[in-house]
């Protein structure tokens, strides 16, 4: 029998391929908006609200994604659930929460910040509803402009894309073409990533985990990014002595 011999080490080839895949993954677009993109987005929508009240709905939707860290299925009507205004509720300590059902049909409550309450009041004025929701307010959170019920995921994606397009247009007009080009890849889910990435910079991880509906803190940790300059600055003062005195 004639034997065939392998001329290359297969384990070595697998390792080389693995390193190559890692480089490809690292080069992928970061799936969140940076501070500049987000600032332009909100500023542009707010400025349009003054001219066209229709953009009040856009402003509320982006506020909810950013301040609550919601998934699209937690704001839009689906076959399984229809979010209503009374999902915003006040507990016995006068704290406001947003009740929702997320991934894996898991119910949770999201802490509602003051900025979200302000946005909710503003939006309710726009749709002709008084003050903050009552426990008996079963109106859709984002009602259709025509017909009954709330908007679905398809319509919600379209509204978000309009907001993205507004920001892209403004970035391009300001000559920030790289920022505009990067934002063309944005999807609705980027808003959740943007929200959580910002949240972990200021809040305890456990709090972010529970609000985001993550199964573990390890999932939340994926959103933590360390600024390289801050990282280097914190390392510069390390010494060999426990009393931090320089010996070399």
Task: Explain the meaning of each model-derived region.
Residues 237-248:
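C-terminal secondary-structure termini that scaffold catalytic or DNA-interacting sites
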Residues 39-72:
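Basic, Lys/Arg- and aromatic-enriched nucleic-acid-binding interface segment
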Residues 1-14, 70-73, 166-170:
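N-terminal DNA-binding recognition helix of tyrosine site-specific recombinases/integrases
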Residues 77-122, 128:
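Conserved tyrosine-mediated DNA breakage-rejoining catalytic core shared by Y-recombinases
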Residues 5-43, 145-149:
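Flexible interdomain linker/hinge and immediately adjacent N-terminus
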Residues 113-182:
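Active-site/catalytic core of tyrosine-dependent DNA strand-transfer enzymes
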Residues 50, 157-210:
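Short, basic (Lys/Arg/His-rich) helix/loop patches that form interaction surfaces
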Residues 212-237:
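Catalytic-site neighborhood detector that most strongly recognizes the C-terminal catalytic loop/helix
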